[in-house]
């Protein structure tokens, strides 16, 4: 008998109510909130189902759980939609939110819907405009002209974290370098703290912490003074490898380094001024952009040798890291090696390993013994580094210095669909912050997206205003915040009254106890959120340093790809049909679901065909949450069959008891109870450690145990207890069918409000153990004996069991491995 999942899900969802007073909350569960693109995809399903299992389990443990949801609603796709479909970003976004809200509710997620908001709500972004004004007040926001990452497709600036392998994180376009006046947040103020405090995040994946550690990028080194030949000027060079100074053959500086003002050759000046900024190299493009440079004509004196070093302008040196100048030892740095080879510069080896190295092919970057280095000869690299620093300090030309790879966060975006920056520009007063009483600065709705460039700057009236200081004509800032600004504090907004921040509630609820989302946000959203907590604490909004206590990063949902003979992607159903028709089709590997590869499985179709519980259970089965999962049609069908068997087994059992009595039950019944409570204990432990796939396997095992008990007519009190336990432990995973079965077996109240079943610890104590009997190491038989059996009795039993094998042989010795094995060693009679 198949259960009507549509009727069950509709009936149950109407009855659920997960409202909670935030002041009573004891556990805060949050998934990374979605961008309202229009539809919930399978990646969302996995993310939100994991969070829902945790939230439902923690409620069952007796905690008041806060499990809110909102919408990360600003962003470029809304502008693209406005241009493509002639619809305003507001209308497009709200329509998508309505559809996705309906989808989320259909999954059966236990959200506190009364706390829902979208970041495009003016009452939400009013507060981040207020934050920005306070950041200005506390020296955490500033404006400057700087070299920025320009996305020529999206026509906007990107933060360093949004440039991946030299390309825009969203558009995929090759990023150019441009000089623009931008607003920045001073994340570097917290660089040391952000790095050091990673050690305290014991419940974060090590991989995420390592990614942040590398991104923050602490470099401990020294600044060395190089005298410029012919000029009374010193060039300061930062290095983490002072021990290679004897191998230096040139110096490289940034194209905008102040030392270049001393270049007198007109042609050289023109050449440097024409330096192509789009080819500048940072860590995100070190492997994709060719290294090149220009000989500036300037020369520096080597501080320890009677030789001069030419100074090159190089595209791999940036003014915003270190001092904007480096000395280069091509023999022991691959970047320097490539540059030296290109421009025929000397390559001097100063580190010698035991084996010979071929410096014609690549730099040697390993350890070894110093040579060709004067007073450093014969030293190890570590000793040489210390000695060189001591020497240079004694000469008065060196000081120790720490730099960070992390740069301040550029937050200006030349887009319409974002939060307006609350700044006014007055010719008389300069930069004037908007008064807090005049917030929020809202977006105009009559916007034209057909013109290129910044839509707000192109608006005929919006940017024109009066200076709040002098009353003169003035202009608004037409850039908007980077959308990561919104997602960097939303977890605190859920704690507030309205959409602001309630300090007392935030101090109580934060950090979020369980935060679930993709690892792709390790150095974007997660790092920015950590910064925001510190910045808002400095401004007095609350006293919280870390936003998330426990972080769970789920893998992707993948699906096979199908290609025709021309290499065009096919929809899976079309590919399978063509294969059946004998046509040429290549079945590719399973890849992340994407529209471009046509391997997307639509959630609405799955729920309509199999139900929400089937979708939830599939997405949590078989695979640990941190690993990728492959979508297979046969697996979702298998899950659906299990739910129907579960329904039939419980509905058909007509001996349900609600008050269990276990007096005078058989030994078999006791054994079954022990097994049931062992499985319950295993499921509980699996949930505590996020082993959701293991918990699923265990409750399916429990289903089989109950089925066997029913078949063998085991005491109905024992069976009833097992059924009640099963229904309760499956509820976090498959809440609709569980809630309905709870009603059918006579459960009181709503199942989602019932406590987790308690494990009877006495039933976990094994009264008997299985011991393997061996003769000369060969298996004879496994016997069940009391777990407190003494050795002499055990030996007697073993000898009796093995008598036939022993025969007339002599027993030489008997070895016992407690609770596991007894081995009888015999010798043949002469």
From Swiss-Prot:
Task: Please give the CDD domains that the UniProt record associates with this protein.
Answer: Anticodon_Ia_Leu_BEm (cd07958), LeuRS_core (cd00812)
Q: Which reaction does it catalyse?
A: tRNA(Leu) + L-leucine + ATP = L-leucyl-tRNA(Leu) + AMP + diphosphate
The UniProt entry, under InterPro entries, shows: aa-tRNA-synth_I_CS, aa-tRNA-synth_Ia, Leu-tRNA-ligase, Leu_tRNA-synth_edit, M/V/L/I-tRNA-synth_anticd-bd, Methionyl/Leucyl_tRNA_Synth, Rossmann-like_a/b/a_fold, tRNAsynth_Ia_anticodon-bd
Q: Which residue stretches, if any, does this entry annotate as coiled coil?
A: none
**Would the keyword Kinase be found if you checked this record's keyword annotation?**
no
What EC number(s) does this enzyme carry?
6.1.1.4
Annotated family: Belongs to the class-I aminoacyl-tRNA synthetase family.
Alphabetical UniProt keywords: Aminoacyl-tRNA synthetase, ATP-binding, Cytoplasm, Ligase, Nucleotide-binding, Protein biosynthesis
Task: Output the Gene Ontology terms for molecular function.
Answer: aminoacyl-tRNA deacylase activity; ATP binding; leucine-tRNA ligase activity
Q: Which GO terms of type biological process are on file?
A: leucyl-tRNA aminoacylation
User: Where does motif 'KMSKS' region map?
Assistant: 592-596
Work out whether the entry's keyword set contains Protein biosynthesis: yes
- HAMAP family to which the protein is assigned, alphabetical: Leu_tRNA_synth_B
Recorded protein name is: Leucine--tRNA ligase
Q: Where is this motif: 'HIGH' region?
A: 34-44
Q: Where does ATP bind?
A: 595
Q: Indicate where this protein resides in the cell.
A: Cytoplasm
**Where is it found, in Gene Ontology cellular component terms?**
cytosol
**Annotated source species:** Ehrlichia ruminantium (strain Gardel)
What is a single Pfam family found in this protein's UniProt entry?
A: tRNA-synt_1
Main EC class the enzyme belongs to = ligase
